[in-house]
Amino acid sequence: MVEPRDTVIREEDLNPDFLEELSELVEPVFEEEEVLSVQACYQCGTCTGSCPSGRRTSYRTRLIMRKLQLGLVDEVIKSDELWMCTTCYTCYERCPRGVKIVDAVKAARNLAAKKGYMAKAHRMVAMFVIKTGHAVPINDEIREVRKNIGLDEVPPTTHRYEEALEEVQKLVKINEFDKLIGYDWEEGDLVD
Protein backbone atom coordinates (compact mmCIF):
# COMPACT_ATOMS: atom_id res chain seq x y z
CA MET A 1 0.00 0.00 0.00
CA VAL A 2 1.27 3.46 -0.85
CA GLU A 3 1.72 5.65 2.19
CA PRO A 4 0.07 9.09 2.16
CA ARG A 5 2.54 11.90 1.61
CA ASP A 6 2.86 15.25 3.25
CA THR A 7 1.59 17.46 0.44
CA VAL A 8 2.25 20.79 2.08
CA ILE A 9 5.20 22.58 0.51
CA ARG A 10 6.61 25.31 2.69
CA GLU A 11 8.48 28.24 1.21
CA GLU A 12 11.40 27.67 3.56
CA ASP A 13 11.81 24.15 2.13
CA LEU A 14 12.28 25.46 -1.41
CA ASN A 15 15.68 26.09 -2.91
CA PRO A 16 15.24 27.72 -6.32
CA ASP A 17 19.00 27.51 -6.92
CA PHE A 18 19.18 23.77 -6.24
CA LEU A 19 19.54 22.70 -9.88
CA GLU A 20 22.37 25.20 -10.38
CA GLU A 21 24.09 23.94 -7.23
CA LEU A 22 23.55 20.32 -8.21
CA SER A 23 24.96 20.91 -11.69
CA GLU A 24 28.09 22.52 -10.21
CA LEU A 25 28.53 19.72 -7.70
CA VAL A 26 28.36 16.93 -10.25
CA GLU A 27 30.13 18.67 -13.14
CA PRO A 28 33.04 16.21 -13.32
CA VAL A 29 30.52 13.44 -14.07
CA PHE A 30 27.57 15.18 -15.69
CA GLU A 31 27.42 18.21 -17.94
CA GLU A 32 25.62 21.22 -16.52
CA GLU A 33 23.06 21.11 -19.34
CA GLU A 34 22.07 17.55 -18.41
CA VAL A 35 21.04 18.52 -14.91
CA LEU A 36 19.58 21.87 -15.93
CA SER A 37 17.43 20.18 -18.59
CA VAL A 38 15.07 19.33 -15.71
CA GLN A 39 13.88 22.94 -15.95
CA ALA A 40 12.29 22.08 -19.32
CA CYS A 41 9.99 19.48 -17.75
CA TYR A 42 6.35 20.54 -17.95
CA GLN A 43 5.03 17.60 -15.91
CA CYS A 44 3.20 15.73 -18.70
CA GLY A 45 3.75 12.40 -16.92
CA THR A 46 5.09 10.49 -19.93
CA CYS A 47 8.11 9.46 -17.88
CA THR A 48 6.02 8.03 -15.06
CA GLY A 49 3.61 6.31 -17.44
CA SER A 50 6.41 4.55 -19.31
CA CYS A 51 8.62 3.66 -16.33
CA PRO A 52 8.98 -0.12 -15.84
CA SER A 53 10.05 0.39 -12.23
CA GLY A 54 7.06 2.61 -11.53
CA ARG A 55 4.70 -0.19 -12.48
CA ARG A 56 5.96 -2.32 -9.61
CA THR A 57 7.12 0.20 -7.01
CA SER A 58 6.18 3.57 -5.57
CA TYR A 59 8.68 5.26 -7.90
CA ARG A 60 7.13 8.24 -9.69
CA THR A 61 9.60 9.85 -12.07
CA ARG A 62 7.48 12.96 -12.59
CA LEU A 63 7.36 13.58 -8.84
CA ILE A 64 11.15 13.36 -8.53
CA MET A 65 11.53 15.80 -11.46
CA ARG A 66 9.08 18.25 -9.86
CA LYS A 67 10.88 18.10 -6.53
CA LEU A 68 14.17 18.76 -8.33
CA GLN A 69 12.59 21.76 -10.07
CA LEU A 70 11.34 23.15 -6.78
CA GLY A 71 14.63 22.53 -5.03
CA LEU A 72 13.16 20.23 -2.38
CA VAL A 73 16.63 18.91 -1.68
CA ASP A 74 15.96 16.89 1.46
CA GLU A 75 12.83 15.30 0.02
CA VAL A 76 14.77 14.17 -3.04
CA ILE A 77 17.98 12.90 -1.48
CA LYS A 78 16.31 11.21 1.50
CA SER A 79 13.65 9.39 -0.52
CA ASP A 80 13.83 5.66 -1.11
CA GLU A 81 12.22 6.27 -4.50
CA LEU A 82 15.40 7.93 -5.75
CA TRP A 83 17.05 4.50 -5.72
CA MET A 84 14.22 2.68 -7.52
CA CYS A 85 15.19 3.95 -10.98
CA THR A 86 16.82 1.15 -12.98
CA THR A 87 18.50 3.64 -15.36
CA CYS A 88 16.90 1.98 -18.39
CA TYR A 89 16.46 5.39 -20.10
CA THR A 90 12.88 4.63 -21.23
CA CYS A 91 11.73 7.92 -19.70
CA TYR A 92 14.40 9.88 -21.55
CA GLU A 93 13.63 8.19 -24.86
CA ARG A 94 9.95 9.09 -24.55
CA CYS A 95 10.23 12.56 -23.02
CA PRO A 96 8.74 15.10 -25.47
CA ARG A 97 11.04 17.80 -24.05
CA GLY A 98 14.28 15.80 -24.12
CA VAL A 99 14.80 16.15 -20.38
CA LYS A 100 17.86 14.16 -19.30
CA ILE A 101 15.87 12.46 -16.55
CA VAL A 102 18.22 9.57 -15.78
CA ASP A 103 21.24 11.85 -15.65
CA ALA A 104 19.41 14.10 -13.19
CA VAL A 105 18.46 11.08 -11.07
CA LYS A 106 22.07 9.85 -11.08
CA ALA A 107 23.30 13.33 -10.14
CA ALA A 108 20.81 13.43 -7.26
CA ARG A 109 21.97 9.96 -6.19
CA ASN A 110 25.57 11.16 -6.16
CA LEU A 111 24.57 14.03 -3.90
CA ALA A 112 22.52 11.71 -1.69
CA ALA A 113 25.45 9.31 -1.35
CA LYS A 114 27.82 12.14 -0.46
CA LYS A 115 25.41 13.23 2.27
CA GLY A 116 25.07 9.70 3.65
CA TYR A 117 21.76 8.68 2.08
CA MET A 118 22.14 5.52 0.05
CA ALA A 119 19.80 2.59 -0.35
CA LYS A 120 20.87 -0.49 1.60
CA ALA A 121 20.66 -2.63 -1.56
CA HIS A 122 23.10 -0.33 -3.37
CA ARG A 123 25.46 -0.41 -0.42
CA MET A 124 25.30 -4.23 -0.44
CA VAL A 125 26.19 -4.37 -4.14
CA ALA A 126 29.07 -1.98 -3.47
CA MET A 127 30.23 -4.25 -0.64
CA PHE A 128 30.24 -7.23 -3.02
CA VAL A 129 32.44 -5.24 -5.41
CA ILE A 130 34.87 -4.49 -2.58
CA LYS A 131 34.95 -8.07 -1.33
CA THR A 132 34.94 -9.95 -4.65
CA GLY A 133 35.44 -7.45 -7.46
CA HIS A 134 31.93 -8.25 -8.73
CA ALA A 135 28.50 -6.77 -8.15
CA VAL A 136 27.13 -10.32 -8.41
CA PRO A 137 29.73 -12.72 -6.99
CA ILE A 138 30.04 -16.23 -8.34
CA ASN A 139 28.38 -18.99 -6.35
CA ASP A 140 28.25 -22.79 -6.50
CA GLU A 141 25.25 -22.78 -8.84
CA ILE A 142 27.00 -20.54 -11.35
CA ARG A 143 30.16 -22.63 -11.10
CA GLU A 144 28.12 -25.73 -11.93
CA VAL A 145 26.45 -24.06 -14.91
CA ARG A 146 29.82 -22.88 -16.22
CA LYS A 147 31.21 -26.40 -15.86
CA ASN A 148 28.19 -27.94 -17.63
CA ILE A 149 28.59 -25.70 -20.66
CA GLY A 150 32.29 -26.37 -20.97
CA LEU A 151 33.73 -23.30 -19.30
CA ASP A 152 36.18 -23.12 -16.45
CA GLU A 153 34.26 -23.14 -13.18
CA VAL A 154 35.94 -19.90 -12.14
CA PRO A 155 35.99 -17.09 -14.72
CA PRO A 156 39.24 -15.25 -15.50
CA THR A 157 38.32 -12.25 -13.36
CA THR A 158 39.00 -11.15 -9.81
CA HIS A 159 37.60 -14.52 -8.75
CA ARG A 160 40.65 -16.19 -10.26
CA TYR A 161 43.27 -13.48 -9.92
CA GLU A 162 43.83 -12.32 -6.35
CA GLU A 163 46.13 -9.52 -7.54
CA ALA A 164 43.28 -8.09 -9.65
CA LEU A 165 41.03 -8.01 -6.59
CA GLU A 166 43.80 -6.29 -4.65
CA GLU A 167 43.94 -3.63 -7.38
CA VAL A 168 40.17 -3.10 -7.15
CA GLN A 169 40.44 -2.74 -3.38
CA LYS A 170 43.35 -0.34 -3.75
CA LEU A 171 41.24 1.88 -6.02
CA VAL A 172 38.36 1.69 -3.55
CA LYS A 173 40.63 2.99 -0.78
CA ILE A 174 42.24 5.70 -2.92
CA ASN A 175 38.84 7.05 -3.93
CA GLU A 176 37.43 6.56 -0.40
CA PHE A 177 34.54 4.57 -1.83
CA ASP A 178 34.70 2.37 1.26
CA LYS A 179 34.00 5.40 3.47
CA LEU A 180 31.19 6.53 1.19
CA ILE A 181 29.29 3.26 1.62
CA GLY A 182 30.34 2.69 5.23
CA TYR A 183 32.48 -0.40 4.72
CA ASP A 184 34.50 -1.72 7.68
CA TRP A 185 37.61 -3.57 6.46
CA GLU A 186 38.18 -5.34 9.79
CA GLU A 187 34.60 -6.62 10.03
CA GLY A 188 34.29 -7.19 6.29
CA ASP A 189 30.82 -5.72 6.45
CA LEU A 190 28.83 -2.52 6.28
CA VAL A 191 28.54 -0.25 9.29
CA ASP A 192 24.99 0.98 9.79
Swiss-Prot record:
The keyword Nuclease does not apply. Keywords: 4Fe-4S, Iron, Iron-sulfur, Metal-binding, Methanogenesis, Oxidoreductase, Repeat. Binds 2 [4Fe-4S] clusters per subunit. The gene is hdrC. Its cofactor is [4Fe-4S] cluster. One of its GO terms (biological process) is methanogenesis. Residues 32-61, 75-105 form the 4Fe-4S ferredoxin-type domain. Part of a complex that catalyzes the reversible reduction of CoM-S-S-CoB to the thiol-coenzymes H-S-CoM (coenzyme M) and H-S-CoB (coenzyme B). Pathway: Cofactor metabolism; coenzyme M-coenzyme B heterodisulfide reduction; coenzyme B and coenzyme M from coenzyme M-coenzyme B heterodisulfide: step 1/1. Its EC number is 1.8.98.-. PANTHER family: IRON-SULFUR-BINDING OXIDOREDUCTASE FADF-RELATED, IRON-SULFUR-BINDING OXIDOREDUCTASE FADF-RELATED-RELATED. [4Fe-4S] cluster 2 binds at residues 51, 85, 88, 91. InterPro entries: 4Fe4S_Fe-S-bd, 4Fe4S_Fe_S_CS, CoB/CoM_hetero-S_Rdtase_csu, HdrC_iron-sulfur_subunit, Helical_ferredxn. It comes from the Archaea. The keyword Ribonucleoprotein does not apply. It is an enzyme of class 1 (oxidoreductase). This is CoB--CoM heterodisulfide reductase iron-sulfur subunit C. The heterodisulfide reductase is composed of three subunits; HdrA, HdrB and HdrC. GO terms for molecular function: 4 iron, 4 sulfur cluster binding; CoB--CoM heterodisulfide reductase activity; metal ion binding. Belongs to the HdrC family. NCBIfam families: CoB_CoM_SS_C. [4Fe-4S] cluster 1 binds at residues 41, 44, 47, 95. GO terms for cellular component: plasma membrane.
